[in-house]
Amino acid sequence: MSDGEADNGEPADARDLFTWLSREVHELVSHVPRVHGAPRPIQFLREFVSANRPVVVTDAFNDWPAMERWSLDYLADAMGDTKISVNVTPDGRGDALLSTRGWTVSGTGDDEKTPDEVFVVPEERKMTMREFVDMLETPVGDDHGDVHPSHRPPVPYVSRQCGSLLEEFPKLVGDCSHEMRFASDAMGKAPDAVNLWIGDERSETTFHRDHYENVYCVVRGVKVFHLLPPCDGRLLGYREAPAAKFTSSREGGTFGVELETPRRLVSWASATPASLRSRACTVPEDPVVPIVVEVRAGECLYLPAMWYHHVTQARDERGTPAIAVNYWYDMNFDDRYAYARFTQEAHARFGGESTPR
């Protein structure tokens, strides 16, 4: 029993309400179910979208030609000389908080102190798919552990959002689909954006949430999602930091950090799956840990809007990196959104831990 919890298990004060809420939600959604084959739209809407519950759907897109065709060589040949956008980082972490210790930071004013921490986004480079594949498949030794990240080999990741499949990869659209029919029929609309993702085990997406219903289809490799429901944003250690981006010296191969001008503060999560597991051991009265979901080739994950997620990936048994297509459907800004906003604002005032703003 926590200090603020009554003998009957009910919350006794405002702060303890948040622990109680997490416990209630995790009892309702303790795991992510798996269903075989594309569900009927009414079933998908009733059991998962309306219930705000993630689900893995297996064998939902076996008819895609991509399931047979997509290899790195095929993608490179299909795209030819077309330039694509590739996000490049020194450590695989794009859109993340970064300590500036040991980094060369540019963009500070004459009288401005270098910030201790920044919110950094990847460097975006234009290259052909073949050049991306060559960079991705260049062997990387194990002797970089003691080297500062600014001097490590670049980690490329095809991860541009807001409709990258249709905008940058039109030659690949015929290999998959412009929508997931069961999801479009259930939600009564086409997806707002369809994105292509290609990366290996070095790339990591830090905890965040989206205001989209997300249907994430894995064609090759494995995607590993760590999920938290909307009520658990309080645990993610949000901090504000100035916005910045990675820059690199192509000749010397070193990375630096460039601050945005004018200055812009971004609130972002600092927690990791490992830090949340550690916290659960040291705070046993509030032992929240993420739900871990592996999504393999031929499977898709429905990730409800506003659920927090951290994503990594792995190669398959043939050594092919993770290749995926995801569909973003605009969420309905209904009472669920209002409840999530209320919880967020209440915790910011009474909870004692950081929360997204």
Predicted regions and their residues:
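N-terminal accessory scaffold of Fe(II)-dependent oxygenases
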Residues: 2-300, 308-357
